[in-house]
Amino acid sequence: MTALSRLAATVEARKGADPESSWTAKLFAKGPEKCAEKFGEEAVEAIIAAVKNDRANLVYEAADVLYHLTVMLAARDVSLDEVLAELDRRAGTSGIAEKAARG
């Protein structure tokens, strides 16, 4: 099991937890919109770290992005496996061809 798979399993397990006992459960209790907002905030922080060429902070913020992406997906009942299957589907297809196929 990869670190990302373990993270997804832990996040999923927190869905029904007491919001006072878990940060993840607290995010779920605030609703999917708040989960999406937190993902956006963390993405911006990662972008800033990248623009500033702050490697250590970029690694830190990228981990936050992955965590909050996982929470946001779970809040909308989208599994990590679904996202990975989409990546597998796209494998071997150029980005240009994939974008053109979307219209």
Swiss-Prot record:
GO biological process, any: L-histidine biosynthetic process
GO MF: ATP binding; phosphoribosyl-ATP diphosphatase activity
Main location per the UniProt record: cytoplasm
Pfam family, one: PRA-PH
Pathways involved: Amino-acid biosynthesis; L-histidine biosynthesis; L-histidine from 5-phospho-alpha-D-ribose 1-diphosphate: step 2/9
Cellular component aspect of the GO annotation: cytoplasm
Keyword ATP-binding: yes
Catalytic activity entry: 1-(5-phospho-beta-D-ribosyl)-ATP + H2O = 1-(5-phospho-beta-D-ribosyl)-5'-AMP + diphosphate + H(+)
Keywords, in A-Z order: Amino-acid biosynthesis, ATP-binding, Cytoplasm, Histidine biosynthesis, Hydrolase, Nucleotide-binding
The UniProt record lists the keyword Hydrolase: yes
Enzyme Commission designation: 3.6.1.31
UniProt cross-references to CDD domains, sorted A to Z: NTP-PPase_HisIE_like (cd11534)
InterPro entries found in the cross-reference section: HisE (IPR008179), PRib-ATP_PPHydrolase-like (IPR021130)
Family: Belongs to the PRA-PH family.
HAMAP family: HisE (MF_01020)
Name recorded for this polypeptide: Phosphoribosyl-ATP pyrophosphatase
Chain's gene name: hisE
